[in-house]
Regions:
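Helix-start/capping segments and mature chain N-termini
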Residues: 1-173
Length: 173
């Protein structure tokens, strides 16, 4: 039996400019030998649980750690931070290698923006100048706060705006 539930939504303009809130959730991204987190064809129960945990915490999305305690992804999107002009994202070992994620990494490299796929901690995240999410639906969505802590100015930062503009130019081609 195959069940497909389609949903059509529009981005909330307020969230696209003002940013969203994240809460670190206890649900982690799974190990590849139990449910490969890089594939979009398995049950998404862990992401659904993370979404419910974020909602219970009063956040828009749940920030998920990998099995080793490093920041990884959210329940629905890939996660990036900006520190001192450099863009950081997870190694990709425990998240979907999303098309928008890959395009943002490629855009950074093509435009001389330092970008790192690395392990990083919640402390690194709390001290970030900016944070944003990538996804097909929201492109580059700014993160205003994580666990009640304001990130940067609490609004879309200059790097997120630059990457959003570069991405829009790319998809126009």
């Amino acid at each position: 039996t195959l069940v497909i539930i389609m949903e059509h939504s529009k981005p909330v303009n307020r969230l696209q400019s003002a940013g969203i809130s994240l809460a670190t959730v206890p649900q982690v991204r799974g190990l590849p030998n139990s449910q490969d987190p890089k594939l979009n064809s398995h049950s998404k129960l862990n992401c659904i649980i993370a979404c419910l945990q974020a909602e219970a915490a009063g956040a828009d999305e749940g920030l998920m750690l990998d099995p080793h305690g490093f920041v990884n992804t959210t329940n629905a999107c890939n996660f990036f931070i900006v520190r001192r002009g450099a863009v950081w994202t997870s190694t990709g070992d425990y998240c979907m290698n999303g098309i928008t994620r890959r395009k943002v990494i490629d855009l950074c490299r093509a435009n001389g923006i330092p970008v790192f796929e690395r392990n990083f901690s919640l402390v690194d995240t709390y001290g970030a100048d900016e944070a944003f999410l990538t996804g097909t639906f929201g492109a580059q969505t700014p993160v205003a706060s994580i666990d009640g802590r304001q990130i940067g100015t609490g609004e879309m930062g200059p790097m997120t705006l630059r990457l959003r503009d570069l991405y829009k130019d790319l998809i126009k081609q």
